[in-house]
Amino acid sequence: PGIEERTLRAMLSAEGLRGVVLETFGAGNAPTSEWFIRVLEEAIDRGLIVLNVTQCRGGRVMMELYETGLRLQRIGVLCGHDMTTEAAVTKLMYVLGLELPREQTLDLLRTPLKGEFTD
């Protein structure tokens, strides 16, 4: 809340940035402003990986549950299920460090490797 379009756009355009962890509300809901979705979609279209995790202490991301999560899913945001923020950052760093083709990278992020999330 409170972030402006130019700030988000600048953050997602940082040189060398390949992935981000998006901490969302509850079951994976983010702001619904058109500009917010558009900026995320543009970043994903440029190849940025966005991994959605909940900022709640318990629970999980279920992007199909509410319209706001569905919008994120439709533009290519990945579901972090019940991964903690720390696990998501670590996994993203590890998988991106493998320097694999994009589809393999996305497949690894969608698959539990060491129990970091439950299906």
Predicted regions and their residues:
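Active-site catalytic microenvironments in core metabolic enzymes, especially phosphate/sugar-handling
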Residues: 12-119
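A broadly conserved detector of short glycine/acidic/proline-rich loop/turn motifs that flank catalytic sites
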Residues: 1-3, 26
